[in-house]
């Protein structure tokens, strides 16, 4: 954004309704005081993130083992139930801040923040004059064309498939089997260990793509690597606790620290 030329239309469009989208909206609104910011999303409004302590136990280190040992259907059920701890949600305080900003602008009669709810982008055309974005409101079918200086896509991501990375080593199964220690299952003639940092949500739970369990996971992988070394005498097993114990009262596994 800092390398952009001078704004021609004084308008931004942000697509998405998660934490990243809301933070981008807040940033653009604050750093470009003359510009409009239009947030386009298909829901009616932002959904608050569930940061309640009971729900956030799904990020606890010991929960990883429980989920891994559970039936696949149960893991999927819990994943769907607790998506609101991480996916397509916004911190409640930020929701309140943006709502208050929009409300003040409505009262003052000088609007710069627009929430285009139940809407979708149907066309984007870029030329030398900027970007023309067509937005369709699903409630009444109305289509507006917004001429803007930049479009920010905060629509999330899909994890990259492992197949292209593994090449000929890729198994025929759609989801490669992953052990509890994050080691990818390989044929007997493959002696090297392949460990996954991320990409294990379907087997190890929601915490796989977050920082909540990163230190513990690194310790578990290190222990597994050392245990599999063919040294004589055997390498001493590393206890995860020896890597640095976190006080019991620490909230590293909760959403506040994510």
What are these regions (language model features)?
Residues 1-19, 23-258:
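Flavin (primarily FAD) cofactor-binding/catalytic cores of flavoenzymes
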């Amino acid at each position: 954004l800092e390398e952009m030329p001078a704004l021609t239309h004084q308008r931004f469009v942000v697509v998405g309704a998660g934490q990243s989208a809301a933070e981008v909206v807040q940033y653009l609104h604050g750093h470009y005081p003359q510009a409009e910011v239009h947030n386009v999303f298909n829901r009616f409004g932002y959904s608050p993130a569930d940061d309640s302590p009971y729900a956030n136990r799904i990020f606890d280190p010991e929960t990883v083992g429980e989920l891994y040992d559970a039936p696949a259907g149960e893991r999927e059920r819990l994943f769907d139930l607790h998506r609101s701890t991480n996916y397509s949600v916004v911190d409640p305080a930020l929701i309140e801040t943006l709502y208050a900003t929009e409300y003040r602008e409505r009262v003052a009669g000088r609007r710069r923040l627009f929430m285009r709810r139940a809407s979708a982008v149907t066309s984007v055309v870029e030329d030398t004059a900027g970007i023309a974005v067509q937005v369709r409101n699903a409630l009444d079918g109305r289509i507006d064309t917004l001429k803007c200086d930049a479009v920010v896509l905060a629509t999330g991501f899909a994890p990259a498939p492992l197949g292209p990375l593994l090449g000929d080593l890729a198994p025929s199964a759609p989801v490669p089997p992953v052990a509890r220690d994050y080691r990818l299952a390989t044929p007997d003639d493959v002696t090297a260990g392949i460990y996954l940092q991320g990409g294990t949500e379907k087997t190890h739970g929601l915490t796989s793509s977050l920082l909540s369990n990163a230190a513990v996971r690194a310790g578990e992988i290190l222990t597994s690597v050392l245990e599999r070394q063919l040294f004589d005498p055997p390498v001493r097993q590393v206890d995860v606790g020896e890597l640095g114990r976190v006080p019991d009262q620490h909230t590293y596994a909760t959403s506040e620290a994510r």
